[in-house]
Every structure is written in C-alpha cells, then in structure tokens.
Amino acid sequence: MLGSQYSNKKRKRGMEAPPQMSFSEQEHLLWTDELLDYFMLQNSNEPLPQPPEPPQTIDLNRPVDDKGHTPMHWAAAMGDLHVVSTLEQRGARLDCQAHNGETPLMRAVMFTNNWDKQTMDRLVDRLQGTADMSDWFGSTVFHHIAATTCSKSKYQCARYYLDILLTKLGEIWPPEMLTALLEKGDHNGDTAIILSLIHI
C-alpha cells in the first residue's frame, strides 16, 4: 500500500520518489512527509498536533529535501526544541551538513523562528559544539548571521542571535578562540564583520 501511495509521486520537497522502494525507504518517506507537514503547521493558525515519532529503524541523518537538509536542520530552523531533543536522543547528529556544508546552527540563524520563540539560548546550549564549523564556502555561523542583515527587518533578530552566541561561546571558549572565529574569512576573504558593514 505504501509503495503505490508514493510510486512516481513528486514529493513536496522537490525530490522525486524512486519508482520502487524498500519498506524502510517507504517508512522514511512517510515519516519525513509527516514531519515537514508538522513544521509547516507551525506557521499557520491551525491547532498544532504532536510531532510524529520517528520509526525505530529510520536513518535520522538522511536528507529530507533536495538541498540535503536533515530533520535536525529543519527542527533547529523552526526553533522546535522538543523535536531537536527527540532527534538527539535517538542518535541524530548535531553536526550534520547539508549539500552546501550548512549545519543546523547555521540554518537556524537564517530564520526568525528562534527569535519569535525566544529559544536561541537553549538551542545554542545544544549546538554550541558545532559553532566553529564552516560550510563549503568557508562561511561560519557568524557569516550566516551577517548575511541576514541585508534585510533591515531582520536587524533585531540578527543582533539577538549574535548576542546569544557571543555570550554562550564566551563562557566556554578562550577569548582568542572566539576572536579567531569572528575574524575568519570566507573563500572571498570576507569576515562576518565585513559582511555586516556592507549591509549597513
């Protein structure tokens, strides 16, 4: 039944379902569709159901969209700490990277959900171990925050994310380590500070 339901079906995330799938693949597809539906309901006025429980045999680090984002990327971006916690307890990696090298923490700062919910401090508590990672363009989480400042409507959100990260990392990192990350250039040689100044 599951096979016929998803056979040759264009998935909502832009990924084509293979014509023939194993039961585990069908199970993964069904769960990820339900999970993304759950996330989408958070932006609507409809009553929010409980998030779908991942099947025991599912690979939680497998991408769920055509950009290579995993369930952890989505949960972090939506500011859903319950799902983040559930995924972590079930063995999902906090340092998973999308096709462009983006981490869940980087993904989170690109959206305002953690600002709207005031959840960034608790999210950083879980993801701070990935704060020194770079994507394939050499960009750090601070570059990603700086990139959002091209929209004036996101200034306050970006400042909130920046303050949280600086405070949390400052509590556990030596000052020179934090300074080095802030001064790190991407593949164009631009630091997060330079990008922020460009957008002012």
Each language-model region and where it sits:
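Fungal intrinsically disordered, low-complexity polar regions
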Residues: 1-57
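Ankyrin repeat domain, specifically the short helix-to-loop turn at the C-terminus of the second helix
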Residues: 52-59, 85-93, 121-131, 163-180
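Ankyrin repeat boundary signal
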Residues: 60-64, 94-97, 131-134, 183-185
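Conserved small/polar residues in nucleotide/adenosyl-binding loops
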Residues: 198-200
